Amino acid sequence: MNYNHKEIEKKWQNYWEENKTFKTNDNLGQKKFYALDMFPYPSGAGLHVGHPEGYTATDIISRYKRMQGYNVLHPMGWDAFGLPAEQYALDTGNDPREFTQKNIQTFKRQIQELGFSYDWDREVNTTDPEYYKWTQWIFIQLYNKGLAYVDEVAVNWCPALGTVLSNEEVVDGVSERGGHPVYRKPMKQWVLKITEYADRLLEDLDELDWPESIKDMQRNWIGRSEGAKVTFKIEQSDQNIEVFTTRPDTIYGTSFLVLSPEHPLVNEITTSDKEQEVKLYQNEASKKSDLERTDLAKEKTGVFTGTFAINPLSGDKLPIWIADYVLSTYGTGAVMAVPGHDERDHEFATKFNLPIIEVIEGGEVQKYAYTGEGKHINSGELDGLENEAAISKAIELLESKGAGEKKVNYKLRDWLFSRQRYWGEPIPIIHWEDGSMTTVPEDELPLLLPETDEIKPSGTGESPLANIDAFVNVIDEKTGMKGRRETNTMPQWAGSCWYYLRYIDPHNEKMIADPEKLKHWLPVDLYIGGVEHAVLHLLYARFWHKVLYDLGVVPTKEPFQKLYNQGMILGEGNEKMSKSKGNVINPDDIVASHGADTLRLYEMFMGPLDAAIAWSEKGLDGSRRFLDRVWRLIITDENSINKKIVDSNNHSLDKVYNQTVKKVTEDFDTLSFNTAISQLMVFINECYKTNEVYKPYIEGFVKMLSPIAPHIGEELWDRLGHENTITYQPWPTFDESLLVDDEVEIVVQVNGKVRAKINIPKDLSKEEMQDLALSNDNVKMSIEGKEVKKVIAVPQKLVNIVAK
């Protein structure tokens, strides 16, 4: 008889809830384990089968660690601010609060039906004022530390969404959400000085147990490069152009300068006869994304400003051009073009017939850019030097002339933080009529997001909050001075930068969390989530954590010690699941048809946790069949314990049981759940082959199965005669001596040829091995009529007989 998953799963979910089985105590003396999931954005679509993969992995580890005696923190919450809820509200006229709350209820129900062992008393929601009070508090600390500032920057303006997007939210010139066109436009924005932490964000990656590929993505995003800052004087002007270059040694090969179309000097230095052409070009460039502009396959375009600069070492006059392949967001937004030794510059020079000067020998620079090593030529004092020596010498020369210095540059830009939307945390700043700016007093936090029916973006660059006079206008009670509240809101990233801290002490009204509790629980021991958050969320959270570390709020330099990215679950045809393809699988349907335990087991058995694997109904059915086999081994059709489960040990399962405990333990430690499940299947197959199964072995098996399939685990534990939940039962141990057989098979050779294979007790002496070998019938036949000259015995391996 198969088990009734609907009945069993509901029964144990109710039991866990009523008994608060997974409530985490703050026993600060106990060894701890903090297992964290990337909390979800509660969308209208609800959970899909991709969500439970990561959640099941952390849940297995959490249950496993509890059984190993750890104090486990395993929480869940909601990343509920952000564009999607607001977009839905705009499209349907529904309030984002109601929509978000309804979605959270659906998500929570679905998650609870999958049997995850979360401590729901620690649930957080980024849109809860008691939560975002502390998001605002962190912003104030950033502001006080000089890390939050207002700047006029060329931003990614998306008219359709009515807001500014960060570089990371723009893909191929369109918004990541919705695919709307994005344009570059100068606007006043709040910016966070993440660049101040660039070196630490880079260096501390080495201390983390993260996939190397993710570390590399962060390293590339930060993009540290060493070189020089070079100052070029503009002819007939007191202005200078500053350039960052990693190759100051090629300065004698500079034949022109290129500025980005947005460079602040462009309008100032352009001559009147070039004005119209330059303005037209700037306008065209503003419609292109950074990716389009830097596409190497794209034909180079540009316009001459009519003005020249002076090469500080050679004294040559250099025409100043603008071109969209130079970005204002990288380096200084200006490039010293060395067409002889840079492919993009060569392409540009060839198109506009600009000089190409060879300064490193070894190529044919009139035909193509030579980017290899070589001796310097046509380079004054640098002649004859190789690259590295020439770089040092060039910096020395520039410094002596006051025209440059050694410099480290980062690709990383400061974090564009403000959003012109309604559904986000209000920024706690007041702008006063005398031009000054102050933060909202900390004792007045949270600064509440006002309720309103009018949440449409203003389209002018201001958020909908600008339309709410009662929110915007303030008067200083002491001075009578009038002020306006900041109307921009924070991005969705803000709440997710620090949520892992709030789980540690979620109801604390006086501080983010108690310092002693932070000291106990940090860092997070295991963080599992999708690879799509490799750069943004993880980099932003690391940045905030380091600021809080500097402020003495948190005791660790890094938030997440071990990171693991689960793979993607694809549709049956190896295609990405999507509504448009109609191949999305709803976990509710699987829970109803096969049970939550089957879904959990199947998603862990599909393949390695980090691989992209196609969904298979056959695989799902196979996982259910295995659980039915487990059930039938222990429970009879009459609903009683199988008589073959006995209290005495006939030792037939000693080896496979101990092997199973060892393998499952090791595999859980490395998140190799698919191979752990394979071993559990091996054990069950062996149990079916024997007449008797030793009860402690079955109990050990149920303990090992329960983190993966907790409902059937609890039910079988209960049926085996135990009153308490299996949750805190000690994890099984194995006996090393039982991992090997008492007997071994040895080979018997006569004159080098195998004549017999025999099983012998493994502790037999050499003499006993020889006697056994010589008494074997096959061996006797082989040596009949011959004289045995020598017998060599190798314990547990072979006996070699030489006979003539």
Curated annotation (Swiss-Prot):
One Pfam family cited in the UniProt record for this chain: Anticodon_1
Motif range ('HIGH' region): 40-51
Highest taxon of the lineage: Bacteria
Annotated EC: 6.1.1.4
Motif 'KMSKS' region boundaries: 576-580
Location(s) in or outside the cell: Cytoplasm
UniProtKB keywords: Aminoacyl-tRNA synthetase, ATP-binding, Cytoplasm, Ligase, Nucleotide-binding, Protein biosynthesis
GO cellular component: cytosol
Coiled-coil zones: none
CDD domains for the chain: Anticodon_Ia_Leu_BEm, LeuRS_core
Catalytic activity: tRNA(Leu) + L-leucine + ATP = L-leucyl-tRNA(Leu) + AMP + diphosphate
Principal localisation: cytoplasm
Gene Ontology BP term (one): leucyl-tRNA aminoacylation
Chain residues that bind ATP: K579
The protein's enzyme class: ligase
Family designation: Belongs to the class-I aminoacyl-tRNA synthetase family.
Name assigned to this protein: Leucine--tRNA ligase
Underlying gene: leuS
